[in-house]
Amino acid sequence: MAETLEFNDVYQEVKGSMNDGRLRLSRQGIIFKNSKTGKVDNIQAGELTEGIWRRVALGHGLKLLTKNGHVYKYDGFRESEFEKLSDFFKTHYRLELMEKDLCVKGWNWGTVKFGGQLLSFDIGDQPVFEIPLSNVSQCTTGKNEVTLEFHQNDDAEVSLMEVRFYVPPTQEDGVDPVEAFAQNVLSKADVIQATGDAICIFRELQCLTPRGRYDIRIYPTFLHLHGKTFDYKIPYTTVLRLFLLPHKDQRQMFFVISLDPPIKQGQTRYHFLILLFSKDEDISLTLNMNEEEVEKRFEGRLTKNMSGSLYEMVSRVMKALVNRKITVPGNFQGHSGAQCITCSYKASSGLLYPLERGFIYVHKPPVHIRFDEISFVNFARGTTTTRSFDFEIETKQGTQYTFSSIEREEYGKLFDFVNAKKLNIKNRGLKEGMNPSYDEYADSDEDQHDAYLERMKEEGKIREENANDSSDDSGEETDESFNPGEEEEDVAEEFDSNASASSSSNEGDSDRDEKKRKQLKKAKMAKDRKSRKKPVEVKKGKDPNAPKRPMSAYMLWLNASREKIKSDHPGISITDLSKKAGEIWKGMSKEKKEEWDRKAEDARRDYEKAMKEYEGGRGESSKRDKSKKKKKVKVKMEKKSTPSRGSSSKSSSRQLSESFKSKEFVSSDESSSGENKSKKKRRRSEDSEEEELASTPPSSEDSASGSDE
């Protein structure tokens, strides 16, 4: 029999909202941790009195009752898990896990039973529904009716607002059944009633959220905040955590109360109550209870008369009444010696406190992030200056928190803290051109060499040079853009010949022509520069004929065992299947693993053998391809050399430039001299001669020499 049982997909109903978590059963007791709030239910094995197994909306549920009357319900179990749980209860808790079905007749009359903190509506011996009395916020009575109102949960999509019970009159004298019903409810209900005197009162305390000054009245079951505009009654059961945080100036203290559900002010919800105290402010406090009551209720944690700093008195009283530990900063110490880091979150500046189990930011808006919620953290270079950096936190739910404008000197301390807590660090520094190395960044000075800054300067110089080249009117080209075989040389000769040939008596026309030539030349140069860019190298695809790589021993075993794992765990997801397979593989003996290691070794040998055969065949084919390419190159060289023998390179370039000449360079001036006409005739005669030379086939000698090659 296993010493522990663990269930990951278990749900707990909290005021109409189903919260998932992990349930762990051990010899010592039962522990449930809420994944959303982090709240832990710890039930000692000796306190359990009864365990009930029943069918519920989410499969099957487990109901646990304790000696002090508390009831715990957990849903989401499979029917097949009953035997495993039943045996565990018998072995370790000496309890019989009973099966008990709910009544589904649909009747609306029955018997009401009060047991512990539950109101159970039964038909016969079967319960129809149960109401946790701790969820009741108000109980009112009518003539023959009792109305129950409930605390609301903001996370619940549908909430139960109220339930009305009709209580028929009885013949007994002196007993009012309606009043008796109401008293049974009120004795266990979480009804906030400011009856009696407060235990103590703190006057005019400064509250940051919700903002204002409030009188805080401490009652046995709730906290009453009384301000000029608003009043809040906060049950101690809604307090999740308490924090006592020193301000960076060492003269003030924050006292933070985490609430779930939050208090409301109109449409605004406050999940945190933040009080600000001065360290120099002292107070003498007297509790409104006699010494015996104080000793019996608080067991030495409080005394009737106390004195000290105001923040110490408030935190001490709250700790005793809420019965929760106060979280303080751990051993983290920043560059300035403070236990916090100055930063900005969203639009406001505040303080980030690295704690032993999480981070908390105060104060606007306050944020608390537990380590078990964090997926990874990231150190990013600040966008405006290198004197600061950003600290990013992404949770497992995908929520991202960015704390910006953190001083560079804090980097080393924060990095060491994150490393010590073993949080995943995912840097984006390489994407932003920043070297993510801790030592270089933490110890850098303003005068020290910054590789990122130097690279940005070099890129800026290159862009400026490119811009100057494109706007340069001299027409000079760099060595990189000079290619004799391309048609840019033809364009230059076309411009040169036209510049010397077109002589007009009108200076204005010549200036306009010159501007048009420059514009066309710029466009042509830019186009050629784009066309001469290096082609993008296409990644070679994998050869489909190549032999596949051999699988590892684990992968061979997983492929063979996948169906068996699915049959043993029906409905298991792919992620859970992989985790389960990893656990099984780790637990396997060496003898079983050796069998799969041998199979993996055989597969590796087969792969090496196939790879040698494949590479040998590929080498022969590559040699044939190279010989074919050489033949093609020779044929191309012969074709290129043939027309160059008929005319000079200059005449051929002139012929190409004339054939592509635009209208902008054709002189249409009526006052041009006769020299232009004679030059045009000469050009036409030269063009006709070049066409004849180009049309004549190569001589027999040329063809013979080409064949010899």
Swiss-Prot record:
Residues 696-709 have a biased composition (Polar residues). The modification Phosphotyrosine is found at residues 441, 452. Its main location: nucleus. The modification Phosphothreonine is found at residue 170. Residues 515-533, 625-634 have a biased composition (Basic residues). GO terms for biological process: DNA repair; DNA replication; nucleosome assembly; nucleosome disassembly; regulation of chromatin organization. There is a cross-link at residues 90, 296, 364 (Glycyl lysine isopeptide (Lys-Gly) (interchain with G-Cter in SUMO2)). GO terms for molecular function: DNA binding; histone binding; nucleosome binding; RNA binding. Changing residue 510 to A: Unable to bind DNA. Keywords: Acetylation, Chromosome, DNA damage, DNA repair, DNA replication, DNA-binding, Host-virus interaction, Isopeptide bond, Nucleus, Phosphoprotein, Transcription, Transcription regulation, Ubl conjugation. The keyword DNA damage applies. Residues 470-496 have a biased composition (Acidic residues). It is found in: Nucleus; Nucleus, Nucleolus; Chromosome. SUPFAM superfamilies: HMG-box, PH domain-like. This is FACT complex subunit SSRP1. The lineage of its organism: Eukaryota, Metazoa, Chordata, Craniata, Vertebrata. The gene is SSRP1.
